[in-house]
A protein has these predicted regions:
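Boundary-proximal intrinsically disordered activation/regulatory segments immediately upstream
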Residues: 1-50, 131-132
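S-adenosyl-L-methionine/SAH cofactor-binding core of RNA-modifying enzymes
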Residues: 50-94, 137-169
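RNA substrate-binding interface of SAM-dependent RNA methyltransferases
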Residues: 38, 94-169
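Short active-site oxyanion
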Residues: 21-24, 42-45, 59, 123-125, ...
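General beta-strand structural signal in soluble alpha/beta enzymes
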Residues: 26, 63-64, 127
């Protein structure tokens, strides 16, 4: 159920501080929400204007009006559903090909890079600590679901590259 308190929490998730505090982020659009079920992300709750779309075991699905959806959406023209998801702990995986990013500040650019990495089959992106947060709503939207398939890890990239065992191009 969508309470005033929950609306306030969801609206606060546009800021990294609150995403970290609540360990939650927002995903918008039915297509991406349906993909989450096949990933290692956990959906806490789905808010939708069509209850017939989602029947996930252990996930609360709440009906909302278009007015309520507009309140909790970060989009100017909200889609039909919003999912509240838990942030997962990302750990570095051993993979030959990966992208290392330093200081990317534009959420749309990071989202596009993640989407391209997914398209090329790159499973991991290492980001410097000052790179925009992968769970920023604009990044999530720009990835078009690719954040589900690409592991994004934040670390000190100088230390990481000093100990990286594979060839660096």
């Amino acid at each position: 159920m969508l309470t005033a308190h929950k609306i306030k929490i969801i609206q606060s998730l546009d800021k990294k501080k609150y995403r970290q505090k609540y360990n939650l982020f927002l995903v918008e659009s039915n297509k991406i929400i349906k993909e989450i079920e096949k990933s290692n992300y956990k959906i806490q709750e789905i808010f939708t204007n069509d209850l017939t779309l989602f029947n996930y075991k252990g996930v609360e699905v709440s009906a909302v009006s278009d007015v309520e959806l507009k309140k909790i959406s970060f989009l100017q023209h909200p889609k039909d559903s919003v999912a509240l998801c838990e942030i997962k702990n990302s750990e570095i995986i051993d993979t030959d090909i990966q992208i290392v990013l330093d200081g990317i500040q534009d959420p749309g650019n990071l989202g596009t890079i993640i989407r391209l990495a997914d398209w090329f089959g790159i499973k991991q992106i290492i980001c410097s600590d000052d790179t925009v947060d992968v769970y920023n709503p604009k990044v999530i939207q720009a990835t078009m679901g690719s954040f589900l398939r690409v592991n994004v890890v934040y670390t000190n990239i100088h230390d990481y590259l000093d100990t990286y065992p594979h060839a660096i191009i």
